[in-house]
């Protein structure tokens, strides 16, 4: 606890909030080029092959970003857009690749939550019982 004299001499320091996505540099999204596309395994209770990419951003950072959805068309030198948002069971993965922008294709045959995966709205005639797998 400082004395009043110490507070007069120099005021209290403001606590600086540390950002969770420093590579974005206060921007909502950033463009980057994939330097490596690979799969990795999640932390202890979970088991899978998660698709991730190493991305060199326009801000100069090189980060690991998660590729959401089923299937993707990314390879080395693909231009991608990333947003913030970590993947809880992948240590060091703090960013998501945005599907349906630049070189990243949207998820095929996606019916629900399409906006999150860059999927276009299906044609009204194309939605038959055979494609959805549901009985009427």
Curated annotation (Swiss-Prot):
Residues found modified as 3-methylthioaspartic acid: 89
UniProt GO cellular component terms: small ribosomal subunit
Secretion signal span: none
Keyword terms of this UniProt record: Methylation, Ribonucleoprotein, Ribosomal protein, RNA-binding, rRNA-binding, tRNA-binding
UniProt keyword Lyase, yes or no: no
GO molecular function: rRNA binding; structural constituent of ribosome; tRNA binding
Compositionally biased intervals (Basic residues): 113-123
Region of interest called Disordered, as start-end residue ranges on this chain: 1-28, 101-136
InterPro entries registered for this protein in UniProt: NA-bd_OB-fold, Ribosomal_uS12, Ribosomal_uS12_bac
Any one GO biological process: translation
Quaternary data: Part of the 30S ribosomal subunit. Contacts proteins S8 and S17. May interact with IF1 in the 30S initiation complex.
The family this protein is said to belong to: Belongs to the universal ribosomal protein uS12 family.
Entry function: With S4 and S5 plays an important role in translational accuracy. Interacts with and stabilizes bases of the 16S rRNA that are involved in tRNA selection in the A site and with the mRNA backbone. Located at the interface of the 30S and 50S subunits, it traverses the body of the 30S subunit contacting proteins on the other side and probably holding the rRNA structure together. The combined cluster of proteins S8, S12 and S17 appears to hold together the shoulder and platform of the 30S subunit.
Matches recorded under NCBIfam families: rpsL_bact
Name listed for the protein in its UniProt record: Small ribosomal subunit protein uS12
Species assigned in the record: Cyanothece sp. (strain PCC 7425 / ATCC 29141)
């Amino acid at each position: 606890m400082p004395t009043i004299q110490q507070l007069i001499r120099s005021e209290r320091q403001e606590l600086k909030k540390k950002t969770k996505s420093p590579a974005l540099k206060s921007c909502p999204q950033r463009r980057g080029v994939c330097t490596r596309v690979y799969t990795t395994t999640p932390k202890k209770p979970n088991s899978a092959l998660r698709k991730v990419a190493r991305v060199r951003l326009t801000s100069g950072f090189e980060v690991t970003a998660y590729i959401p959805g089923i299937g993707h068309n990314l390879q080395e030198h693909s231009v991608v857009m990333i947003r913030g948002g970590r993947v809880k069971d992948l240590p060091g993965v703090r960013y998501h690749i945005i599907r349906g922008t630049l070189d990243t294709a949207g998820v095929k045959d996606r019916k629900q939550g399409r906006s999150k995966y860059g999927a276009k709205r299906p044609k009204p005639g194309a939605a038959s019982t055979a494609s959805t797998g549901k009985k009427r």
